[in-house]
């Protein structure tokens, strides 16, 4: 506090004390004594103590200088006048003012949270009732909706469950009857592919060592040799049949395996052609007609 009085008193006393601490301490107490005390203190601390004492009060206190200071304590004397407390207005208006003229215990403070705050256009029903959520979006005839009848029941081939896609005659559908039942050799389950007479039956293709090209001359060399053997067998069989009973010539042996399916088909066709050509009616057991086969 300011302790007006303080002055003189204390003097003598305080002395030394304050010092130690130097600074006003001692005073600590009285500090107040407004008087010079404390102040100066820091400085000369107590020093002067004893001395000057009184001075302290001298208020002016040279204290500044140190001396006296301590004394300053003036022991408190400087008392805090109750009147000072009486001067402070404890009315709510003084200490509970929120700066807006409203007191903390004033109902006006809560009136600021007016219902209008939660009743503005931000929560207007129109916000969620606009055209973005229009039924026409989900029920239109465009093909850009995932559940549009026009998409699933149309005749386009771009729908995975379109009847026109699965039942068409194109060969681009994995379950198309035309693909699985055709006569092409490009289907894995085609009867013509698996049940043909290409040269891998009866051991013709790889029996008797014919299937392995020990001479390492390549697939075509092997194929030529296999066809030549088949042609020779066909001619021999036809000749024997013609001499004995003039019956039809035996069918030519199948071409050896190897080479493409198409090459095998050609080889088979030529072998049969050779067999048919070499057969003939024997005349009195005469030799049947012979026809040389040109190698592939």
From Swiss-Prot:
Its main location: secreted. Residues 1-77, 198-210, 244-259 have a biased composition (Gly residues). InterPro entries: Diverse_Func_Domain-Protein. It comes from the Eukaryota. Residues 80-96, 103-194 have a biased composition (Acidic residues). Signal peptide: none annotated. Component of the acid-soluble and acid-insoluble organic matrix of calcified shell layers (at protein level). It is found in: Secreted. Residues 1-219, 233-296 are annotated as: Disordered. The keyword Secreted applies. Disulfide bonds: none annotated. Keywords: Secreted. Residues 233-243, 270-281 have a biased composition (Low complexity). GO terms for cellular component: extracellular region. This is Aspartate and glycine-rich protein. It comes from Haliotis asinina (Donkey's ear abalone).
């Amino acid at each position: 506090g300011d302790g007006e009085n303080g002055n003189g008193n204390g003097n003598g006393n305080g002395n030394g004390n304050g010092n130690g601490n130097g600074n006003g301490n001692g005073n600590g107490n009285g500090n107040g004594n407004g008087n010079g005390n404390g102040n100066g203190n820091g400085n000369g601390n107590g020093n002067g103590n004893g001395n000057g004492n009184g001075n302290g009060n001298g208020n002016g206190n040279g204290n500044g200088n140190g001396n006296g200071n301590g004394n300053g304590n003036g022991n408190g004397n400087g008392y805090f006048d109750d009147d000072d407390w009486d001067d402070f207005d404890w009315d709510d208006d003084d200490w509970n003012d929120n700066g807006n003229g409203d007191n903390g215990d004033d109902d006006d403070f809560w009136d600021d949270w007016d219902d209008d705050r939660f009743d503005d256009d931000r929560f207007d029903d129109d916000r969620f009732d606009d055209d973005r959520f229009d039924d026409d979006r989900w029920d239109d005839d465009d093909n850009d909706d995932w559940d549009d009848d026009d998409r699933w029941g149309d005749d386009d081939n771009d729908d995975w469950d379109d009847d026109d896609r699965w039942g068409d005659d194109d060969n681009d559908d994995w379950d198309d009857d035309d693909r699985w039942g055709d006569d092409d050799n490009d289907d894995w389950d085609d009867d013509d592919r698996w049940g043909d007479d290409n040269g891998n039956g009866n051991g013709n293709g790889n029996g008797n060592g014919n299937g392995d090209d020990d001479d390492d001359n390549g697939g075509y060399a092997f194929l030529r040799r296999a066809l030549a053997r088949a042609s020779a067998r066909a001619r021999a069989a036809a000749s024997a049949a013609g001499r004995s009973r003039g019956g039809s010539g035996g069918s030519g042996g199948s071409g050896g395996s190897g080479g493409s399916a198409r090459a095998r088909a050609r080889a088979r066709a030529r072998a049969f052609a050779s067999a048919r050509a070499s057969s003939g009616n024997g005349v009195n057991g005469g030799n049947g007609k012979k026809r040389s086969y040109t190698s592939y």
